[in-house]
A protein has these predicted regions:
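Glycine-rich, aromatic-lined ligand/substrate-binding cores of catalytic
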Residues: 139, 552-585
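Histidine- and/or cysteine-centered catalytic micro-motif in compact active-site loops
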Residues: 3, 402, 460, 575-579
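Transmembrane beta-barrel wall of Gram-negative outer-membrane proteins
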Residues: 1-55
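Catalytic-site beta-strand/loop segments enriched in glycine and acidic/polar residues
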Residues: 234-242, 272-281, 531-554
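Short Gly/aromatic-enriched secondary-structure transition segments
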Residues: 160-161, 255, 472-473, 577-580, ...
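Conserved small-residue
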Residues: 58, 63, 337, 444-553, ...
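Extracellular/periplasmic, surface-exposed regions of secreted and cell-surface proteins
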Residues: 31-40, 46-50, 59, 72-76, ...
Length: 622
């Protein structure tokens, strides 16, 4: 197959190279299925992808950030920065027209004259599966072996720079007097002159490459047989994988090995039982008892509509009740590989020999102690659900409720005294509980012969609670994270409202003083400033009133709706997503214009919502 996608950027004047978005991809796949004998089958697959991606460079000069250029152009640019292109030359207004003479940002600064990237991806996939039936031993028994190999190579070519000479437009009198002449002067000349600024620079070139190889091997014994109303199946599986060139310790392959056992039972396809157990090992843990973990699970289901007492009713087409419990493990929580071993020694200051003529020698120290007891983070999960269908299966409904108890979370110990001479390793001591639910409704129907449509809606809720994180108790309970959700803002004041003129007393000299009955901040405040809560009740708002406040950065509620239709091969879909109970904080660069790196502009809704003497009642921001 072949895929080509083109971008939306136009060819801009003066730019002698193509930096538009372009995507070319060739993919291929070949499969061979063969019966080697009457009881032996083989499946061989070969596939791959050859791709090339081109995109404009989006690094903003002076910020060190690499962001989506369209987001940057909308949020950071100044609407009065310039008129665009005049006579084929990018035109800006003088930087003296913005506060502090900062850099002007127009909507093209993120990609015009910045260069472009080209990324070449090559992927090869091979897989082989051989199955041998063993019905001569017992019907339904078989053994299989499977092997897979993936090879990936990426080459990135970076062409940076390529700046293009621009021009700055001035009023003639402004340019002649260096801005000292007042525009109200009757002799002020407002004719426009264009002064070249900047210069053409060549593109610079660099390239980098990356690669990856993955091996996977699997052997399994399968059993699947039906005895009248009873169906029984079983699986015993061994697998191992090796990943070459991982991100950490690149030249040491990452290895996994595991055993899986599974048994299922069904009676008349209405009573269902599934039991699983996994025994997995990870190289991230020390050899011995901590390297391997046992992860059992089981589930049960009942399809009530398969019962005889449900045969004559015409309301419910399908009803299934289900419940499950399982334990899963995670070895990705480690901050680096091989945490059970001490980190490498490195230079750490120096020490001296002698008194009169001391000789200084470099000192070496271990950067991190090893933790031979580091092991799997585990989570015990429960799930209870119900599936329903009505009106000839046109209306469907699903409800799930889950409970999770997570232990062994790898965290940095907080209660250890600071007099310890080296950094302690992370420990498997964290505990978090989680619970929530998900509800979904769907309607699918057909009008006439060719028109089908669907409407689906869903809502989910999830909230966790920190049970233990080795937190040192703070002076006030509202400062502690334990007992609340993960991901909340720490060390913040609780916002109440904005100060108004009615909160102040005007002195004889016109100076505003906050009314004494209000809590007194440790800094002087004025109308329009944010009022924060006095949590400890000492009538002073200071560092003792900082708390763990608000919701986490991830939403507790997520709402979704999908709608679509299909008519004679033409289909249309749309998706709506919403969230609730979530807090995000904008960085200062997005709240105060012309600050910090990038000299960014201010979002309009921030400006419109700021407190001013004319906008006291409608203000939502200081």
């Amino acid at each position: 197959g072949y895929t080509y996608q083109n971008g939306l950027l136009k060819e801009l004047p003066g730019q002698m190279y193509d930096n538009n978005y372009r995507y070319n991809r060739y993919n291929y796949r070949a499969n061979i299925d063969a019966n080697l004998t009457k009881t032996t089958s083989m499946k061989l697959g070969v596939g791959g992808v050859l791709g090339k991606i081109q995109e404009p460079r989006s690094v903003v000069s002076g910020t060190g950030e690499d962001q989506n250029p369209w987001v940057i152009a909308q949020i950071w640019s100044h609407p009065f920065a310039g008129p665009g292109f005049i006579n084929g030359v990018r035109t800006l207004i003088p930087k003296d027209m913005v506060p502090l003479g900062e850099v002007m940002r127009d909507g093209m600064f993120v990609f015009y004259g910045q260069g472009y990237n080209q990324t070449y991806d090559t992927t090869l996939n091979l897989d082989l599966d051989i199955t041998q039936k063993l019905d001569f031993i017992t019907p339904g028994l078989s053994v299989s072996v499977k092997g897979a190999y993936d090879n990936k190579f990426k080459l990135e070519k970076v062409r940076t720079g390529g700046a293009i000479e621009a021009q700055t437009v001035y009023y003639k009198s402004y340019f002649d007097t260096n801005g000292t002449m007042s525009q109200t002067d009757p002799d002020y000349d407002k004719s426009l002159i264009y002064v070249p600024s900047g210069s053409d620079t060549p593109l610079t070139y660099s390239e980098s490459s990356g690669r990856g190889q993955n091996w996977y091997l699997e052997g399994r014994i399968n059993y699947d047989r039906t005895f009248g109303d009873h169906r029984i199946s079983g699986l015993f599986l061994y697998n191992q994988s090796r990943n070459y060139y991982p991100d950490s310790y690149t030249y040491l392959p990452r290895n996994y090995v595991g055993l899986v056992g599974r048994a299922t039972y069904a009676y008349q396809s209405k009573y269902l039982l599934d039991v699983n157990v996994g025994y997995n090992g990870s190289e991230n843990f020390a050899p011995g008892s901590t390297r391997f973990g046992v992860f059992p699970s089981f589930s049960a289901g009942w399809i009530a509509t398969a019962e005889k007492f449900m045969e004559n009713q015409k309301i419910v087409d399908y009803l299934k009740l289900r419940a499950s419990w399982g334990r899963v493990g995670n070895d990705k929580g480690v901050d680096s590989r091989f945490m059970y071993m001490p980190a490498v020694w490195g230079s750490s200051g120096s020490y001296s020999f002698g008194v009169d003529n001391p000789i200084s020698q470099s000192a070496a120290a271990i950067s991190r102690m090893g933790n031979p007891a580091v092991t799997w983070e585990t989570a015990d999960k429960q799930n209870y659900g119900i599936d329903l269908k009505f009106f000839n299966s046109r209306l469907s409904a699903t409800f799930d409720y889950f409970i999770e108890h997570r232990t062994g979370i790898l965290i940095s110990p907080e209660s250890t005294p600071s007099i310890i001479a080296t950094a302690l390793p992370n420990l498997n001591i964290g505990k978090v509980d989680n619970h929530g639910y998900e509800v979904s409704l769907g309607w699918r129907d057909k009008i006439g012969k060719d028109f089908t449509y669907n409407v689906d809606a869903n809502v989910s809720f999830a909230r966790n609670k920190i049970l233990y994180m080795d937190e040192v108790p703070k002076q006030f309970s509202y400062m502690n994270q334990t007992g609340g959700s993960t991901g909340r803002q720490t060390g913040v004041y609780n916002y109440i409202r904005l100060y108004q003129y009615s909160d102040f007393i005007t002195g004889a000299d016109g100076e505003l003083t906050l009314k004494p009955e209000l809590p007194q901040p440790y800094q002087k405040v004025y109308p329009g400033d944010a009022m924060y809560a006095d949590l400890n009740g000492d009538h002073i708002v200071d560092g003792n009133d900082k708390s763990v406040a608000g919701y986490a950065t991830r939403p507790e509620y997520v709402f979704g709706m999908n709608m679509g239709f299909d008519w004679k091969g033409f289909n249309f879909t749309m998706q709506w997503v919403g969230s609730k109970n979530v807090n995000r904080m904008y960085d200062i660069e997005y709240r105060i214009p012309y600050t910090n790196a990038g000299k960014r502009g201010l979002l309009t809704y921030f400006y419109d919502g700021c407190w001013t003497p004319e906008n006291q009642l409608g203000a939502v921001y200081p």
